[in-house]
A protein has these predicted regions:
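Residue-level marker of intrinsically disordered, low-complexity segments enriched
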Residues: 1-3, 108, 231
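Exported/periplasmic ABC-transporter solute-binding proteins
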Residues: 18-58, 62-65, 69-70, 74-77, ...
Length: 312
């Protein structure tokens, strides 16, 4: 409880500092101070977009709260924020809740990314098909030797970022299907902590957002890729190197990488203020170029892929 209170005090202090930056500035499409909520799996993309937006519009200050997708959307439903970056649109029930209060929010698709699976560099297993993944996540397969005899990595330790994260929801909805997620899965806290855990644990299988490892320009991304292996995933019954794919931008574009998902801005801004301006930036040409350079698939720009590397 004390940690949670301290976190919110820090957010309020940050908001106060930003207000100092824009003291006396009226909120418009491109000025003022707002707090937004961001699914933590999308924080690298959000951070770069917000930094460029604030540099372009120096009378605007965006205070991001990086949290689980469930908490981010709950903040929007409670009218605590007017802008959320998430990996799903609003549901019919959520829309009905807004409409009953005379609010008419939007779900704006701005990109496609995916779920990346990472394993320890000492692990010989880095190719999976969807059927094997379903058995791993549901607890039917619990040891690496059941996937590859003689693998020697022991027990499979599946690790997510947060119990309420979008990655957990994706695995439950899109991989497990009607099967329950195994209680053997556990949460590390954040995507960075998932990467750290996998880097030091030979038997770990980590589940993270692709944008944590997709930006070749980012030295932190390159450091992460030196610490772990990014798994290949296949739709085929028998996964081979030739029919399995890593989450490259090109394979997100063609759909050959199976674990894709869309990124949405959830906007409830009846006054058409700064949240609407931020949305127009993300979905406009400059914001979409940032998506492209981050190694993700933009929603509204053509993709010109000229080269595909052999390894992430």
């Amino acid at each position: 409880m004390n940690i949670r209170i301290g976190f919110w005090l820090l957010c309020l202090m940050s908001l106060g500092a930003c207000k100092g930056k824009t003291s006396g500035v009226q909120e418009t499409l491109f000025s003022g101070v707002i707090r937004v909520a961001v699914d933590e799996t999308l924080s690298p993309l959000a951070e770069e977009e917000i930094n460029v937006f604030e540099a372009q519009y120096n009378q605007a200050a965006i205070v991001p709260l990086y949290t689980s997708e469930v908490e981010a959307i709950n903040l929007l439903l409670r009218d605590s924020v007017r802008w959320v970056l998430a990996t799903r649109p609003l549901t019919e029930n959520e829309l009905e809740s807004f409409h009953s209060r005379k609010f008419f929010p939007e779900s704006v698709k701005i990109a496609t990314d995916g779920i990346a699976l990472i394993v320890n560099r000492q692990n010989a297993d880095s190719i999976f098909n969807l059927n094997t993944l379903q058995k791993v996540f549901s607890g039917e397969i619990t040891r690496w030797e059941e996937i590859t005899p003689g693998a020697g990595a022991g027990e499979i330790q599946v690790v997510f970022d947060h119990p309420n994260s979008s990655t957990v929801r994706y695995v439950i909805d899109s991989i497990c299907g009607e099967k329950r997620l195994s209680e053997r899965c556990h949460a590390a806290g954040t995507n960075r902590e998932v990467i750290d855990y996998v880097a030091r644990t030979r038997g770990a299988l980590g589940v993270i957002g692709v944008n944590w490892i997709s930006d070749a320009r980012d030295s932190l991304c390159r450091d992460f890729l030196e610490e772990v292996q990014v798994a290949r995933v296949s739709r085929a019954d028998r996964a081979t190197y030739g029919n399995s794919y890593q989450p490259y931008q090109y394979y997100l574009y063609t759909g050959q990488y199976p674990l894709c998902r869309d990124i949405y801005i959830l906007l409830n801004d009846p006054r058409s203020g700064l949240p609407s301006g931020l949305t127009s930036f993300f979905s406009g040409s400059r914001g979409q170029r940032i998506v492209l350079k981050a190694g993700l698939l933009p929603a509204t720009m053509p993709v010109n892929i000229v080269n595909v590397r052999d390894q992430i």
